[in-house]
Design a protein with these regions (language model features):
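Feature captures the catalytic ectodomains and active-site-proximal regions of enzymes
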Residues: 1-409
């Protein structure tokens, strides 16, 4: 049996008055998601371990069956792997957003949804102006880039910008980790690391404000914002962990997810036109997943758009991304693999909720559905946050999902 996970990032949500007390998943027209729930088995999943913030790097790593307490090193190292940057032993890699500040506050976490070409222009400019033997700016995707600090210390506290929309930015500057007292002579101190990053933030603002790109633009990409740093992780591959998987692929527009896939031993498939937004190439991603499954045992198909809509607080857009996921991802994948001689097991789930009224991730269980041709359905008939609480799988946590999924034969 082959296995595919279809993950709608941030797709889960809360009940919304405008939708008559329904969640976006309950309200949107999703016949194929509902089919998987009705003809399959469902449940709820805790994706965030105790002591961790509800980030996509945490949730997606847990969904794939890893113990975060053993492998977690933050987003930076994962994104470094995705873009082909070979981390050295004393490197600290940290995510570097390009964001928009206005009136002393974080207006958005994405600088007005930069294209990758626009982000590359600004990151190369910043590396020329601020980079040196200790500091290197590296282009990623869109507004999501990488900052590498030689001998940097990961024991710092950073504020993910998507968690703090409309908040004053100065109180959110980098701080040394409270209570951390160990000394490593190979690295600068947490305080020195925080000071260095804050200095780069301040200097980036004057440089970006005066860049011709921002002078001709209504939305401003006018500050960097580093967060989620760490060292090179040590992870076993999925093939080493699950004998059912001989080979597999990850399909995502997001460096973070590609980086997880890299360390998990998956091939990284890059789909032209995959943007991570509502305008992504859904058909191309579905087709790539189907073709990969013809040759391999496992595919992790990640769709980012609903998470971005949640962060923007855009309910109409979130509803649209959910409908698109149903009609342009779930439908073609199901219709293709359901006809194959070799059975394929499909799992559908988000990694975490990103409620539009909160505009950030929350640590709550998410609904999942698992279908294959011979499965005995439970009594759930629709796919959403409420219905799946009645599912036969009950409430699973962390690695239990992958263990359950891979045992299905």
């Amino acid at each position: 049996m082959k296995h595919i996970i279809i993950l709608g990032d941030g797709m889960a949500d809360h009940a919304i008055d405008r939708l008559g007390g329904k969640t976006p998943l309950q309200y949107a027209d999703t016949p194929y998601m509902n089919f998987l729930a009705k003809q399959g088995k469902t449940g709820m999943l805790n994706t965030i371990p105790d002591g961790f913030l509800p980030g996509s790097e945490v949730a997606n790593t847990a969904i794939l069956g890893y113990d975060l307490n053993k492998v977690y090193e933050g987003r930076g190292p994962l994104e470094a792997a995705s873009i082909g940057y070979e981390m050295q032993p004393n490197d600290m890699a940290i995510r570097c957003n390009i964001i928009e500040l206005a009136n002393g506050r974080i207006k958005n976490h994405h600088g007005g949804h930069l294209t990758t070409e626009e982000g590359d222009l600004l990151i190369k400019f910043l590396d020329k102006e601020l980079g040196n033997d200790q500091v290197k700016f590296i282009t990623g995707i869109q507004y999501r880039h990488l900052l590498v600090i030689k001998n940097g210390n990961k024991h710092i506290t950073c504020a993910p910008p998507h968690d703090h929309p409309n908040e004053e930015w100065k109180p959110l500057l980098v701080k040394p980790e409270e209570g951390y007292t160990e000394y490593n002579s190979d690295r600068i101190t947490p305080q020195a690391t925080a000071d260095l990053l804050n200095d780069l933030i301040i200097k980036s603002q004057s440089l970006l404000a005066n860049h011709p790109f921002n002078r001709q633009r209504t939305e401003k990409a006018n500050s960097i914002w580093p967060w989620s740093g760490g060292y090179r992780p040590s992870m076993s591959t999925l093939m080493q962990r699950y004998p059912e998987i001989k080979s597999g692929s990850v399909i995502s527009a997001v460096d973070l997810i590609r980086g997880i896939g890299h360390y998990a031993g998956l091939d990284i498939i890059k789909v032209p036109g995959a943007t991570g937004l509502a305008n992504t190439n859904y058909e191309g991603k579905a087709s790539a997943a189907i073709e990969a499954l013809k040759k391999q045992d496992f595919v992790f198909l990640h769709i980012e758009a609903s998470d971005e809509a949640g962060h923007d607080g855009d309910l109409d857009l979130k509803l649209q991304t959910i409908r698109y996921l149903d009609a342009r991802i779930v439908k073609p994948v199901y219709e293709a693999v359901s006809e194959w001689e070799e059975p394929v097991c499909i799992a559908l789930l988000p990694d975490h909720p990103t409620p539009v009224e909160i505009r950030t991730h929350v640590k709550e269980p998410v609904p999942f559905a698992i279908w294959h041709r011979g499965i005995q359905p439970d009594k759930v008939t629709t796919y959403d946050e409420k219905s799946c609480t009645r599912g036969e799988y009950g409430l699973l946590s962390l690695q239990q999902f992958m263990e359950t999924f891979m045992k299905i034969k």
